[in-house]
Amino acid sequence: MILTIDFTDETNEVAAQHTELVEKLLQHAASVESIEPETEVSVTFVTNDTIQDINREYRGKDQPTDVISFALEELGEGEMAVTFEGMPRVLGDIIISTDRAKEQAEEYNHSFERELGFLAVHGFLHLLGYDHMEPEEEKVMFTKQDEILQTFGLGRD
């Protein structure tokens, strides 16, 4: 196991099989990205109301979204990287709205599992520094995302 993943289900509705799917998929993504062993990440499942509150507070957008990531290694202006020898690398937090995942699965006509996996990988790649603000960045991130999902078996039908 490469990643230590701390799961929190604030909805109390996520089935064990879905948590296991996300666990296996993120382990696969970590392998594809050559992440060092004992790296930590947290995944929290929330409702649309909760993610809307987070989106409003941290992004200034008063609406629900599907996934938000908080990268602990992302440095702000003037900040210096601090590392502690012998301590595990902590990537950050992935927060997924299961309500939005269900809505989007229906909207895009694919399974809840595929959407949940997509959102987990999308959030994970953000923790690693991938972004999609510029067209070239988007191409790189979405290509990597598709590769991970496809090789895991959750590609588009």
Swiss-Prot record:
Its main location: cytoplasm. It is found in: Cytoplasm. Its cofactor is Zn(2+). Coiled coil: none annotated. PROSITE patterns: UPF0054 (PS01306). Keywords: Cytoplasm, Endonuclease, Hydrolase, Metal-binding, Nuclease, Ribosome biogenesis, rRNA processing, Zinc. GO terms for molecular function: metalloendopeptidase activity; RNA endonuclease activity; zinc ion binding. Gene3D superfamilies: Metalloproteases ('zincins'), catalytic domain. It is an enzyme of class 3 (hydrolase). Zn(2+) binds at H122, H126, H132. Its EC number is 3.1.-.-. Binds 1 zinc ion. It holds the Pfam family YbeY. NCBIfam families: rRNA maturation RNase YbeY. PANTHER family: ENDORIBONUCLEASE YBEY, CHLOROPLASTIC. This is Endoribonuclease YbeY. The gene is ybeY.
